[in-house]
């Protein structure tokens, strides 16, 4: 095996997806603890806690105890290199979350055992389904009251349309939580409370029919054996091929807060999740083991370092190797760059990088020329596909408090839009500026960042827009007719693309009916 193939085989790049408060930040920290990337898990005990989660770094996140931006963390585990992409998990997140899922090879879904499948999880699973991303499931909070585990598995199957195969099964819950039983290995992992902040060797009992198992389970033993028979009869057996095709999810149980069950999840990602996969470009399919370097930008982050007004482009390497000082071609602007200062991430800790391989995420310093969806190569003209803009779900009109600052406002919004913090629309019929977002909090984030970073104060007003659609039409005359007739609702987005701002769902349906030659797109590829 070549060095290149060996390095690719070692990589696992995945994201964590969950509904707010399902325990995603806690499991992130415990995964880092497993990889010994942090010495002690600084758990976020409450939203007012002074100890901030390692992966929450922007000012607003510190105040609210939520991870707004997508952090990237790399750590070694069992002779593999793990790239973990943390995604915003609070009520209102952004397109960033959706786009992060285009840069990974698998995902870990965290569910609250007391609540089951929640709305945000459904939305994220829809995005995973676009690329048939393999999903590992972790049912969390076993140290509290949870719903019936069989019911939870049924819900995963019914709501998320994916087969659920339990790998471990919980023994009791809340005050009676004794641990989990590994079905295939016939082994009990014993839960020892009080070790949430450290790695311990989990006691293991081999064989459910052993005297030790009977003693540990006590009064729960007979009921558990009975339940297990039911589980084995009713549930799917794990099939790795079905998992790799995105049709089946292996399910684990545990408590992230108690640091229990997380190591089994990480072992599953190493043993079963795919190494970096091939990637489609407009021109051809790129294999990760190819020698030449290629990669695409899926996120831009401003201000990672309060000391510098910098912007970092997050790039997923698709093939080849990054070496410090190498020449790269920025395909969209047809420019060759010498990159000597790429970064690797550990949340807000940043280190200069000597080398990186397919599957890794690196940071490039960006002085305003790099945009989301940009491809970098060693000279080949390539454009990777599948990094879309998603139609916003919420809209606000921007009002400037100081009219003399309109230039700074436009510059700030342009930069924040390129970074994916918001989408900007300029209606043809007025001088208004309309912002679009996927969650309400994005508007707060934009306002506070305009104030902090661009010294611009703005307010928002309600606007009569239900949704946005990007317009395409092969017939130029029809397109011109459409623009005249629909003038009241036509806008240009921040990237210069023609957009229709529909005031209502009914209006959009009528327009689609009246103009069959015009395509109203809910997503737009980055070009």
UniProtKB/Swiss-Prot annotation:
PROSITE patterns xrefs: G_TR_1, G_TR_2
Gene3D superfamilies named in the record: P-loop containing nucleotide triphosphate hydrolases, Peptide chain release factor 3, domain III
Example GO biological process: regulation of translational termination
Record carries keyword rRNA processing: no
Alphabetized UniProt keyword annotations: Cytoplasm, GTP-binding, Nucleotide-binding, Protein biosynthesis
Nucleotide-binding recorded as keyword: yes
Molecular function, one GO term: translation release factor activity, codon nonspecific
Cellular compartment(s): Cytoplasm
GO annotations of cellular component type: cytosol
Residues that coordinate or bind GTP: 18-25, 86-90, 140-143
Signal peptide feature range: none
Residues annotated as domain tr-type G: 9-277
Main location: cytoplasm
Function: Increases the formation of ribosomal termination complexes and stimulates activities of RF-1 and RF-2. It binds guanine nucleotides and has strong preference for UGA stop codons. It may interact directly with the ribosome. The stimulation of RF-1 and RF-2 is significantly reduced by GTP and GDP, but not by GMP.
Cited HAMAP family: Rel_fac_3
Family membership: Belongs to the TRAFAC class translation factor GTPase superfamily. Classic translation factor GTPase family. PrfC subfamily.
UniProt-recorded name of the protein: Peptide chain release factor 3
Protein source organism: Azotobacter vinelandii (strain DJ / ATCC BAA-1303)
């Amino acid at each position: 095996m070549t060095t290149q193939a060996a390095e690719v085989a070692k990589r696992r790049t995945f994201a964590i997806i969950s509904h707010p408060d399902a325990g995603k930040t806690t499991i992130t920290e415990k995964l880092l603890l497993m990889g010994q990337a942090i010495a002690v898990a600084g758990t976020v005990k409450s939203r007012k806690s002074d100890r901030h989660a390692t992966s929450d770094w922007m000012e607003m996140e510190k105040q609210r105890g939520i991870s707004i931006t997508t952090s990237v963390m790399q750590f070694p585990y069992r002779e593999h290199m793990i790239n973990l992409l943390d995604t915003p998990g609070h009520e209102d997140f952004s397109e960033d979350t959706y786009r992060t899922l285009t840069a990974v090879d698998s995902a870990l879904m965290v569910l609250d055992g007391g609540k089951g499948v929640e709305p945000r999880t459904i939305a994220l699973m829809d995005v995973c389904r676009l690329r048939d991303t393999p999903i590992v499931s972790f049912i969390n909070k076993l140290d509290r009251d949870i719903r019936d585990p069989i019911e939870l598995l049924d819900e995963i199957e019914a709501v998320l349309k994916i087969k659920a195969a339990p790998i471990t099964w919980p023994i009791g819950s809340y005050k009676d939580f004794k641990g989990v039983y590994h079905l295939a290995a016939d082994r009990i992992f014993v839960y020892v409370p009080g070790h949430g902040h450290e790695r311990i060797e989990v006691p293991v009992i081999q064989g459910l029919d052993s005297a030790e198992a009977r003693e540990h389970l006590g009064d729960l033993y007979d009921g558990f054996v009975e339940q297990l028979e039911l589980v084995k009869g009713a549930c799917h057996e794990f099939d790795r091929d079905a998992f790799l095709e995105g049709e089946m999810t292996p399910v684990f149980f545990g408590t992230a807060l108690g640091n229990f069950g997380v190591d089994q999840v990480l072992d599953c990602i190493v043993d079963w999740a795919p190494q970096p996969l091939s990637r489609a470009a407009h021109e051809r399919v790129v294999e990760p083991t190819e020698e030449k370097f290629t990669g695409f930008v899926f996120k831009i982050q401003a201000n990672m370092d309060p000391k510098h007004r910098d912007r970092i482009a997050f790039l997923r390497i698709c093939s080849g190797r990054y070496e410090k000082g190498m020449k790269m071609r920025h395909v969209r602007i047809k420019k060759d760059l010498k990159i000597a200062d790429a970064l690797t991430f550990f949340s807000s800790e940043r280190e200069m990088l000597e080398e990186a391989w397919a599957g890794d995420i690196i940071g490039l310093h960006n002085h305003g020329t790099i945009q989301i969806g940009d491809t970098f190569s060693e000279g080949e003209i390539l454009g990777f596909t599948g990094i879309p803009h998603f139609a916003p779900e919420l809209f606000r009109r921007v009002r400037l408090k100081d009219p003399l600052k309109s230039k700074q406002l436009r510059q700030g919004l342009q930069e924040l839009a390129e970074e994916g913090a918001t989408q900007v629309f300029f209606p043809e019929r007025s001088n208004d500026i309309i912002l679009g977002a996927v969650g309400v909090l994005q508007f707060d984030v934009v306002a506070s960042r305009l104030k902090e970073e661009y010294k611009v104060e703005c307010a928002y007003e309600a606007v009569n827009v239900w949704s946005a659609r990007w317009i395409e039409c092969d017939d130029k005359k029809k397109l011109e007719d459409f623009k005249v007739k629909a003038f009241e609702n036509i806008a240009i987005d921040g990237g210069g693309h023609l957009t229709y701002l529909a005031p209502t769902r009914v209006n959009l349906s009528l327009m689609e009916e009246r103009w069959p030659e015009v395509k109203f797109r809910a997503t737009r590829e980055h070009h």
